[in-house]
């Protein structure tokens, strides 16, 4: 997929083990090492929020380095509203479960199933936060 975006270069790829404090530690370490980066993409909102906290602690202005998380959970939505995260990606757990159950039923019946089942993701930008907040009420 990156071949479609030749201007993007991955300079670090590490796991913060889905934890906010470890996301903060990793980002702090990159900053202390002098690693230059323009964006952080974290595989969940917790790690993204930790990265944002590290940048804030280092004196970086909100939005100076774009941070995107995944999940669109309430803490992630709040971080987007506060300008700490540029966006989050909502993974629809209900649609994922529905597709999984449908595939299981087909397997039980001996019917063929697709090798991959695509459940669309939704990008949550600041202007869409209110819509996603309603889903949690």
Q: Which role does the model predict for each range below?
A:
Residues 1-137:
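A residue-level marker of the well-folded mature domains of exported/periplasmic proteins
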């Amino acid at each position: 997929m990156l071949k479609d975006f030749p201007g993007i270069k991955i300079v670090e790829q590490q796991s913060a083990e889905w934890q906010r404090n470890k996301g903060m530690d990793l980002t702090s370490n990159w900053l202390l090492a002098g690693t230059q980066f323009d964006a952080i993409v974290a595989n969940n909102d917790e790690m993204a929020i930790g990265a944002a906290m590290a940048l804030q602690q280092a004196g970086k202005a909100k939005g100076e380095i774009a941070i995107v998380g995944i999940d669109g959970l309430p803490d992630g939505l709040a971080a987007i509203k506060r300008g700490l995260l540029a966006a989050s990606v909502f993974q629809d757990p209900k649609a994922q479960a529905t597709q999984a159950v449908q595939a299981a039923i087909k397997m039980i019946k001996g019917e063929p199933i697709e090798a991959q089942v695509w459940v669309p993701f939704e990008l949550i930008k600041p202007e869409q936060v209110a819509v996603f907040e309603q889903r949690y009420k």
